[in-house]
Amino acid sequence: MAASVRILGIDPGSRVTGFGVIDVRGRDHFYVASGCIKTPADAPLADRIAVIVRHIGEVVTVYKPQQAAVEQVFVNVNPASTLMLGQARGAALAALVSHKLPVSEYTALQVKQAVVGKGKAAKEQVQHMVVQMLGLSGTPQPDAADGLAVALTHALRNHGLAAKLNPSGMQVKRGRFQ
C-alpha cells in the first residue's frame, strides 16, 4: 500500500483565509478537515495578521501536514486590496515556514485548471469539483473549498500521474522546454 502524504492548502485573505487538509495515498485523495479563519474587519492590520499566523499554526499543530501549498496573490483593480492580500499571504507563509513545512505556490489559474480543467472557472465550479473529487456529502464554504482546491492542485501536480510521467518537473509549452 502506498504511503500517505498529508497536505495543507491555504487560500489567503485579509478578512477570510480558507484552509483545507487532505491525505493522498497513491492516486486517491481523502478529506481530513477544512475551515475558514476569520479576522475582525474593524481590527488593525497587525492584529488581523496575528490571527492568521496563530490559527494557521494551530491547524498545523492539530493536523500535522507534511507539505503545504498556498495560492499566489493576483493583482486586483484596487492596489490597497492587493497589498492587504499580499500581507495576509505573507502571514500564512510565515506561519507555515516557522513550522518547517515545505511550501509550494500556485496561481489561481493553475488551481482552477487542475481542479476544474479550465482557468476561467467560477467559484461554484471549483466548489462542485472539490465535493466530487473528495466525495464530500456537503459543500464547504467558498474559502474552505478554495483551500481544499489548492491542496488538491498540489497533490495532482506532485503526487499524481502527472508527476510520475514527468518526474523532472519540466513543462513543455508550445514545443519548448521551460
Curated annotation (Swiss-Prot):
Its cofactor is Mg(2+). Signal peptide: none annotated. Binds 2 Mg(2+) ion per subunit. Keywords: Cytoplasm, DNA damage, DNA recombination, DNA repair, DNA-binding, Endonuclease, Hydrolase, Magnesium, Metal-binding, Nuclease. Disulfide bonds: none annotated. Mg(2+) 2 binds at residue 71. SUPFAM superfamilies: Ribonuclease H-like. InterPro entries: RNaseH-like_sf, RNaseH_sf, X-over_junc_endoDNase_Mg_BS, X-over_junc_endoDNase_RuvC. The active site is at 11, 71, 143. One of its GO terms (biological process) is DNA repair. GO terms for cellular component: cytoplasm; Holliday junction resolvase complex. Its EC number is 3.1.21.10. It is found in: Cytoplasm. GO terms for molecular function: crossover junction DNA endonuclease activity; DNA binding; magnesium ion binding. It comes from the Bacteria. Mg(2+) 1 binds at residues 11, 143. It catalyses: Endonucleolytic cleavage at a junction such as a reciprocal single-stranded crossover between two homologous DNA duplexes (Holliday junction). Belongs to the RuvC family. Homodimer which binds Holliday junction (HJ) DNA. The HJ becomes 2-fold symmetrical on binding to RuvC with unstacked arms; it has a different conformation from HJ DNA in complex with RuvA. In the full resolvosome a probable DNA-RuvA(4)-RuvB(12)-RuvC(2) complex forms which resolves the HJ. The RuvA-RuvB-RuvC complex processes Holliday junction (HJ) DNA during genetic recombination and DNA repair. Endonuclease that resolves HJ intermediates. Cleaves cruciform DNA by making single-stranded nicks across the HJ at symmetrical positions within the homologous arms, yielding a 5'-phosphate and a 3'-hydroxyl group; requires a central core of homology in the junction. The consensus cleavage sequence is 5'-(A/T)TT(C/G)-3'. Cleavage occurs on the 3'-side of the TT dinucleotide at the point of strand exchange. This is Crossover junction endodeoxyribonuclease RuvC. It comes from Neisseria meningitidis serogroup B (strain ATCC BAA-335 / MC58). The gene is ruvC.
